[in-house]
């Protein structure tokens, strides 16, 4: 039986598509970016630090948990690529202490919202008009 992981990706599956992958230099984000690239997409990755290995993806160094970082990403994408077709919001994480929600302070909640929710909100708001 052939599974989807056994098949070689169609190199034109995402041909002509511009794909943004946040947090695209390591782990799941890196794998997602590589898969879109194998499918023929123009891939744009963001992260706070440059990728350790050279690749063919366009890299934008930015901290998307900040308004300045998301503005940098939006402006560069609109100026260079005139928008995107697909956005993968991969960036995120948690710095919550152990002990459950009762131990989480308002400051930790705000930090997690800034790191996990606002990047998607800001990027969607800035890039969605180019996707319609």
Where are the model-predicted features located?
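Conserved NAD(P)H cofactor-binding loop of Rossmann-fold oxidoreductase domains
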Residues: 90-97
């Amino acid at each position: 039986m052939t599974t989807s992981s056994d098949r070689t990706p169609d190199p034109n599956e995402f041909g002509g598509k511009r794909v943004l992958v946040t947090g695209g230099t390591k782990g799941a984000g890196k794998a997602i970016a590589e898969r879109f690239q194998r499918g023929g997409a123009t891939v744009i990755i963001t992260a706070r630090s440059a990728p350790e290995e050279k690749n063919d993806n366009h890299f934008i160094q930015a901290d998307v948990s900040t308004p300045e970082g998301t503005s940098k990403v939006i402006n560069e994408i609109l100026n260079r690529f005139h928008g995107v077709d697909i956005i993968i919001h991969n960036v995120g994480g948690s710095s919550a202490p152990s002990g459950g929600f009762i131990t989480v302070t308002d400051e930790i909640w705000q930090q997690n919202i800034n790191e996990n929710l606002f990047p998607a909100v800001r990027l969607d708001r800035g890039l969605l008009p180019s996707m319609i």
